Amino acid sequence: MVKLSIVLTPQFLSHDQGQLTKELQQHVKSVTCPCEYLRKVINTLADHHHRGTDFGGSPWLHVIIAFPTSYKVVITLWIVYLWVSLLKTIFWSRNGHDGSTDVQQRAWRSNRRRQEGLRSICMHTKKRVSSFRGNKIVLKDVITLRRHVETKVRAKIRKRKVTTKINHHDKINGKRKTARKQKMFQRAQELRRRAEDYHKCKIPPSARKALCNWVRMAAAEHRHSSGLPYWPYLTAETLKNRMGHQPPPPTQQHSITDNSLSLKTPPECLLTPLPPSADDNLKTPPECVLTPLPPSADDNLKTPPECVLTPLPPSADDNLKTPPECLLTPLPPSADDKLKTPPECLLTPLPPSALPSAPPSADDNLKTRAECLLHPLPPSADDNLKTPSERQLTPLPPSAPPSADDNIKTPAERLRGPLPPSADDNLKTPSERQLTPLPPSAPPSADDNIKTPAERLRGPLPPSADDNLKTPSERQLTPLPPSAPPSADDNIKTPAERLRGPLPPSADDNLKTPSERQLTPLPPSAPPSADDNIKTPAERLRGPLPPSADDNLKTPSERQLTPLPPSAPPSADDNIKTPAERLRGPLPPSADDNLKTPSERQLTPLPPSAPPSADDNIKTPAFHPQRMIISRHLPSVSSLPFHPQLHPQQMIISRYLLSVCGFRFHHQPMIISRHLPSVSSLPFHPQLHPQQMIISRHLPSVCGGRFHPQRMIISRHLPSVSSLPFHPQLHPQQMIISRHLPSVCGGRFHPQRMIISRHLPSVSSLPFHPQLHPQQMIISRHLPSVCGGRFHPQRMIISRHLPSVSSLPFHPQLHPQQMIISRHLPSVCGGRFHPQRMIISRHLPSVSSLPFHPQLHPQQMIISRHLPSVCGERLRGPLPPSADDNLKTPSERQLTPLPPSAPPSADDNIKTPAERLRGPLPPSADDNLKTPSERQLTPLPPSAPPSADDNIKTPAERLRGPLPPSADDNLKTPSERQLTPLPPSAPPSADDNIKTPAERLRGPLPPSADDNLKTPPLATQEAEAEKPRKPKRQRAAEMEPPPEPKRRRVGDVEPSRKPKRRRAADVEPSSPEPKRRRVGDVEPSRKPKRRRAADVEPSSPEPKRRRVGDVEPSRKPKRRRAADVEPSLPEPKRRRLS
């Protein structure tokens, strides 16, 4: 037993706080005590000592502490501290003061007379008590308070013991406090609050009143000694008079002081336990939270915390609320157990529910131990038809003598394939059962050849006789249960891993059979004939197969190129059997083609019936790079890539197809039906000879099995389509074509991928082989936005209603190109490229561009609006116009050469080869208000000589930046007009620009007179940034006609003052016309800043430029078209070929 003697004398307590703390700590260090509460109590005692108290006249006070455990020291020191505080309070009222001269005593002497007779409010009882200290405190109150403090200290010790135990347990097991432990602490707090209330009720009101005043005085003394603002003996009523409001109720941490004092109390003052009050609510200080209450009859769920760690005995109302550590052992079966058993109990075997002498039942299999279940369990008798698919592989319980079905009981690890179907399977069985072979039920027959190894099967299997009409495509490979002697259907029993291709169609397939039936041979029913070639191995087939005899009148369009059976001497149609690699052009038309033949007949060379004429270019066969025929009424047209090292190909696209797509192929023609709602192309072997793509008309869905080079999944109404990989060493392709697919996605494949859809909300592009020259095309009609990643050579994004179109990079070593075709795009831009040029109509609903070999010669694609098909071989210029062209001819007519009917003029330059055209052609007079956006980058000419027309002749590659804007640009002018130079206001006139040779035009032509007033936001921002002030803008109608006319447009020039504009080549060297200078070369003094129309004052001698609607009709004659020009004029009428 260790004894510690601490002597507390008045001289010892009169020391300052720092010295007292050091001396007490020296005594504490001399004692080997493991408890940390000893130092904490000593420090608290040093902080709350009272100087000047003689402790009842006693010279010193010896405190003998004997502790067998460390907690006895804490209890004894707390009692000593309480006695010291109470003795000081009691004797303070008797002694008054000791004559000291410090601030505290002087404040006491000054306030005693003012506080005499006043009554304050107790913070606990909320009653008015006397402010005199030391009265009505008897020995009974002290003893009651001592018992309460002891209970409070024991609660602290109990809390520490429980916390130490739990923390030690968590430290060993490496776990944190669980929700159950937290609930245990909350219950302990509730027990502690009940104990507090129990002891507070035993304290008489007289002791409570005195203690309230004592606490208030001790707090004020502590603030004075610590240097904080000090109000001596501040009572609740004095605080109310000073602050002007009622003091709030005490908080949980500071329930002993008022609001203003609690905010300034340092944290070391909160370590002193306060005596409880009888009317304290549940917000007792937290140091007594873990005090357990004595057990009562209604404490069933409020078990002490140390008893919660052991599992409670099961009760009737304990369903699933058992603690988690008690769930490690299986619970006994309950009568009200439902199917919602916790997941941790699902792996525990149930105890036997029947006696050992009871006969085994079918349900005993469910009670087998989990480690013995090496194969799936048999199904239960009450399973309905909606059992999950894993039940199909579960063997049935033995209920009959051994039969053919006993193979199902084979262990799962020995089953090499799926199990056979059951007799009671309905028609809606999942697809995995369809590939299950049937048990042997007949001797081998001649049809067992289907079991031949797959490497020896050179062609598809014959069709089956009992295929129904609406069977899904995966059921074609599903064997039927044996119901007859061996027949041709036994081939279906071949294991699925030996089937190298899809099974042939059935003989009773209706007209909606999938397209794979077209290439499937019929079963032998006659002596060898011409149809036996179908059984020839695929690598030996040099041409397409002939049609079948039972094809109805609605056969797809591939019959047009299909040779008929030999019924007549050789004719011109036999050329169809020629290998595709030897066909340099399209085949001639057939005799039975009706008037609605697809557009491929338009490129078919006709027999010679007339001498060569200008129209013979349309009949020219395929040319070196490519030929494209694009119909007039196609809502969406897709472009097709091809082999880069081979010769050209011909793509024939029908007129009324809703969706047309093609894919990369070796060297082949493509025939596409006319009325197909969905068109798909079929893949084939890439290393073989020609091929033919047959596209069905009435098939709702077309699918094929996996084969060597490619796979194609085409569907019309599929909600989702996924692509499958194929041979990586070949040059295959995968095409996913759908009409109503909400989303289309596919995996990466070797060369390229095309995703074409009409109503797809989103289209994503995929990468492909980087060493080839493939292409990715995303064509859509109603896509709100189209984006794609970078790929090897090119990318084309074609859309009709896209709000924005962005160009993508492509092969860096080649001469790239960028083709962006759109009808209603607010801005259209295209880069200069080496191989080809595209002239795109303005009114086409959908236009598609085609890439070609980058090392070949250039190409020009002319897409007409009213021509059903236009093509040419190695055409250096566009085709001549037709006789039936209306006034709304597309813009490509501007480059159409006129037949030689007059001496050489400026229009002859339109026949210049496309590769020499440096810029777009000038706009026509009949252009509507929606001028293309390529005029946005065209600079305006300066407002002073050198004239603005010279800038147009400057080479485009020397222009470092756009030209400055014009001063008379209105706010609603189209964006392409902002940088467009205006024509000069004197001869040579601005209309001559149209006649300028195309190869000498370095920039876009000036705007037309009928441009609308909708200026883009870019011009408004630039103009607003430049102008120093913004006066009120006046319209042209409100201004008086100025004496000096404005700069007139092309349409404003009178015919008499409009001489023919000379070309750049016609200008003599001595011409005073200076060379066009760049923006940076113009001197600031000669190039004043052009003002906006809004900045021009009404009194300015040079008014602003008026709009088109403000020009008087008499001064703006209507611009005549080419057809309205009389023959007597110097400018000849553009004549047509007819």
Swiss-Prot record:
Biased composition (Pro residues): 349-359
Regions of compositional bias (Basic and acidic residues) in chain numbering: 406-416, 448-458, 490-500, 532-542, 574-584, 908-918, 950-960, 992-1002
Cellular component terms (Gene Ontology): membrane
Localization: Membrane
Segments traversing the membrane: 63-87
Region of interest (Disordered), ranges: 241-263, 291-620, 873-1138
Tree of life domain: Eukaryota
Composition bias, Polar residues: 252-262
Record keywords, A-Z: Membrane, Transmembrane, Transmembrane helix
Membrane topology: Single-pass membrane protein
InterPro entries: NPB13-like_MII_rpt, NPIP, NPIP_N
Keyword Transmembrane helix part of the UniProt annotation: yes
Family from the record: Belongs to the NPIP family.
Protein name: Nuclear pore complex-interacting protein family member B4
Organism of origin: Homo sapiens
